Amino acid sequence: MGFGDFDFLCNKSPLPLCMLVGPYDKPTTDQTPLLNGIGLMSECYPRSIELANTIIFQVGNTFIHIGALPVILIMMYTVKGKYTAIGRKELFHFLSCFLFLTCMSLVVDAGVAPPGSAAYPYLVAIQNGAISGTMWSLVNFGFLGFQFYEDGTRRAMLFLRGTTLCAFLLTFIISLFTFIPSWGSDAIGPHNTVGLFVVLYLFNLIFVVVYILSQFALAIFILQDIWMIGAVALGTFFFVASQILLYPISSIICKQVKHYIDGTFFATVTNLFAVMMVYKFWDMSTKEDLEFSVGQKDNMWETKELLGEDNGMSRYEVNGSEYAGSTFALNQHQF
C-alpha cells in the first residue's frame, strides 16, 4: 500500500468511496472488483433489509443519522437564543454544515442511490465536500476565542461562508475526477487517489488537530477553567474513539455481531458526541448578558424574592391602604 491508497481503510471499513476507487494493482483471478473493474472490498458488511420494496443499507447507521437530526436542530435553536454570545453565528454555521453532512451521509449510507447508479459518484462527492467544509468551519470557529478578528460581522461571515464553499468545491471536484474514469487522467483517477486522500484525510486531520490544540490553549492559558479543559478532553476522546471504531476494529465488530452492525454504527454515535462537546465548550465559555434572557434561562441579575419586612422598608397601612401615606400635609405651615 502506497501513500494515498485506500487499501487499508477500505479493507477494514465499508466506506462509500470504496466502491469508486482502486484496485491499485492489476487484479488477479481471485480478486473481484465491484463495479466495472473498479472498487475495493471490505472484510465485512452489515446486513441490509427490505422495507416496502426498498433495500436499506447500513440499517443501524441509518437510524443513528435520523436520531442525530433533532439533536443537531436543538443545539442550533439554543445557539440562536443567545443573541449576544461570542461566536454565535460561527457556531451556527458549523452546526449547519454538520447538519448538511448528516443528511448526505443518511442518503448515501441508506442506499437512496445504490452503488453502480449514475448518481452515486456525485452523492459521494457531495458527502466528501461536506466533510471538508465542516472541518474548515470547525477550525475557523476555534480561533474566535483569541479575538484575532471581530466575530459575527458581515465581513467575517462572508469570509467564512466563502472559504467554506471553496473547501467544499475543492474536495467535490477532486472527488469527481477521481471517481469518474472518463474525467480523470494518469495523475488522478480511480487508480491514483493521492489527491483525494490529501484533501479528504490529510487536510481535515490537520484542521481537527489545530482546533483541539487551540481549544486546549484557550481553556488552560486564557480561561483557566478545569471544566472547559474537561469538555475539550472529552470531545477529543470521542473523536479518537470514532476513528478507532471506524477503521481498525470495524470489521471485528461486524463479525462478532453476525453482520448486524459494524464500527460505523458506533463511530457515528461518538462523532455526534464530539460535536456536542464542541457546543458544550462554547456554552460554558459564554454567558447571556441581556437584561431579559431570550433563551428563557434565569437571568443572573433577576431578583428572586420580594423585599421582606426585615430589610428596614416594611409596609404599613395608612387609612386602610398598605401604601405609605403622603407627607405633603406635614410640610405645610400655618401663617
UniProtKB/Swiss-Prot annotation:
Its main location: endoplasmic reticulum. It is a multi-pass membrane protein. The keyword Cell wall biogenesis/degradation applies. GO terms for biological process: cell wall organization; chitin biosynthetic process; protein folding; protein transport. It holds the Pfam family Chs7. Keywords: Cell wall biogenesis/degradation, Endoplasmic reticulum, Membrane, Protein transport, Transmembrane, Transmembrane helix, Transport. The chain crosses the membrane at residues 55-75, 92-112, 129-149, 164-184, 193-213, 220-240, 259-279. InterPro entries: Chs7. It is found in: Endoplasmic reticulum membrane. One of its GO terms (molecular function) is unfolded protein binding. One of its GO terms (cellular component) is endoplasmic reticulum membrane. It comes from the Eukaryota. Interacts with CHS3. Belongs to the CHS7 family. Chaperone required for the export of the chitin synthase CHS3 from the endoplasmic reticulum. This is Chitin synthase export chaperone. It comes from Yarrowia lipolytica (strain CLIB 122 / E 150) (Yeast).
